[in-house]
C-alpha cells in the first residue's frame, strides 16, 4: 500500500525528478530522457484525421459510486482485468479484496444518451462490448457466474452482432430493461446494492459483487484543439462534422476523417472508413502517384540450399500474455538442445522494432539460415518476421512460427507447468519443420489495370467513380435498365432531403466519365481467372451473344432488396406498407397517407427471428425519419411505434428524441408476445386494429389505425449465390457476402483481387455504404496501381512421375487451380490461382500432389517431434 501511495504521489505531482527509475524498470528500453521536442515541416497534398477518442470518465456521476466504491469499475477497466497482462494476470478478481466475484452487473449508457451531460448521442459500441465482456468473463471462471446487464435498448446492430446477443442470452446472461438510479455499498462486504426502475416503472434492488459501468466514447480535448487549428467544423458534441453523402470528407477540401473522431463506431466500421478516407485522398492525389516513391532495396538473397541447417529460435514473452503462464527462459534453454539449433534467446516483445534488429544481427553473427519465432499468431505477425528475413538476405519461406499464445498460454492459463511443457513441444515441432524448409520463389503475375464493378447502385457507382478518378478503366455492370439501385426509391435520410439530388448528380458523373463504361440490362454468365487477370463473360438484354471482359480486380456491389412480409395483412390491404413504400408515398404527397389521423409502425418485422436472425440496422432510422416527415406535414397526426429495441445508434439518437418530443408514441413489445393485426369495421369503413401489450401500463392496448407501416429488413438478391460461385467467394448463413476478416480485411474476400461493398455485404445506411464503396475502391487500387504482383509461394505442386491423372485433385479444389492435362494425362497447377489450402494434397491417392512449405516429409517430422519419437 505504501508503494502504491508513493507512486500515486510521484505521478500526481506532474514534474519529473529525473530519478531514472523508469529507465531501469522498462524492460523494453523504450524511455530516453535525452530526447527533445522537435518541430518537423511536411509538405503534403492531403491530410487524414484519425485522432481517435477518449472514454467517458464517470466520476461526475456520483450516484454510481465510481472511485468511491472500489468494486465499481468502468468497462474499460473490467476488460483490462480480464487481460493476461492486466492487474490480476487474467484472473477475474474484485479490486477490494482480490476475491472472485460471483455476481456481476453492467450498467449501460454511462456517459451516453444523456442530455444532462451534453452527451445525447449513442456511443454505438457499448452494448456489444458489454456482452463480449460478459461472455469472456464466463469463459475465464471455473464456476458459474451470475451476470446481469441493465439496459435501455440493446443496440447490437452490427453484422452478426444480434446473433452474438442471442448467444449471450443462451449462455445465461440476464438482460433487464431498467434505469439504475443509485449504487450503494453494502456495509462490511464490499458488495454493491443497485437501485433501479424497471420498464414497469417499479423500483427494485439487487445486490452484486462487482459493477462495470459501460462508458461511452467522447472526442478528446486534443482532437478538438487539432480541429480548430485546421479550421475543421465540428458538430455540437465535438466530433468532426460530415454529411451523409460525403462521410469521410471534412468541411475543408483535401482534409479527410475516419474512425471514432467522425462519430462513435466499432473496429470494422473504423477500418472500412479508414480505407474509404485513403481512397478519397488517393483520388485527389492521383496525378502525383508514384512521384515521391522510394523503392525499398533488399540485400541479395543468400543461397543456403547446400548448407547444413543452422536454426535460430526466438521465444516471446508477449508481456504477460505468454510469460505470465509459460516459463519462457526454461523453453529457451530447451530450444538450445534441439537438433540444428545454434542460437536461442527470449524477448519481451519479439515483434518490436528493436527485436527485429536483434534477429538480423543474430542471423549475421551466428550464420543462421533458418529462423523460428515462438510467439502469437502467424495470421497477424508472420509477414513482419518474413520481412525481417528478407532484410537479412534470407528467403522469407525459411521462416517458421510456433503459436505458443493462442494454442498454449491462453488455453492453459490455470496450468502453467503443462503450458510450459506444451510450449516446448510446439517449439520442437516448429524446429523439426524449419530444418527441412526450402527456399520458395513466388510467381510474378502481370496486372490488367482495369476493374469490373458488379452493381449499378450507389455503392457500385461510388466505387467506379473513385477508381475512374484515380485513372483506372472501369466496367460497370447493372442487370436492370437504370443506374441507382434501391436508392431510386429513397427521398430523404435523417438530416437530409437530398437523396434524389445526390443520386442524379452521381449518375451524371458516372455516365460522363471517360474511364467508366456502363453496361445496362447485362447479366454475368461466367467468370474465371485470378488476381490481376480475370475474365468475365456477360450477356446483354438476355440475348444469346456472349461478350468477354478482361480485368484485374472485381468489386461485388450487387445490392440487396426489401423483404416482402407475409404477415400483418401485407399484400391483402393496400394501407399496409413497408417503410420504404411509406417514404415513397410521403414524397409523392399521397392524400391517404399525409392526411391520415392514426398511423402505426411495427418494428423488426421479418428480422431478428428464425428466418432472418440478423438486425435490419436501417429500419429504426427509417421509422424515425418517416415519423418526423409526417409530423412536419401534419403535426397533430397520431403516430405509434411498436418496437423491441430502438436502434438509433450514434448521432441518430438526436432524431429519436426529437420524434418523442414531437409526440410520437413508442410502445415496447416482447418478441414472445408480438403485436396482433386485424381489420375491424367502424361505421362505414374498415380500420386496421393493432393490439399489443404495454409493459408500463401493464395492460393490453388496441389502436385503430388508418395506415400501418412495417419495418422490414434488406435481404440478399437471388443472383448473389450465382456470383459467389463464379468468383469463388463465400456467403454467410443469411446469404450476404462474407468478408475475409471482419476486422482486418472487412472489404476483401479470401479470394485475392475480389472485393465487396454496399448492401451485398449486409444492411447499412447510405453514408455507411458510401464509405465502404470508397474503401473497396481503395483496396482494389493496391493491386491496380502495380504492374506486377507476386503470387503466394506456398502452393501445390505435382510430381508428374507418380501422377496417374485420376482427376481427384481437380474435383476437390475449391479454387479451380488444379486440373488434368488431357494430353499429358497428369495434373497441373495454376500457381496464380492456388491458395495453398492443401485440399488436393490430402485427397491425392498417389501422393503426387505436394504442398510447398507443407510437404509430407515436413509434416511427418512435426508429428514425430510432437510425439517425441
Task: Give each language-model segment a name.
Residues 1-869:
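Residues forming the flavin
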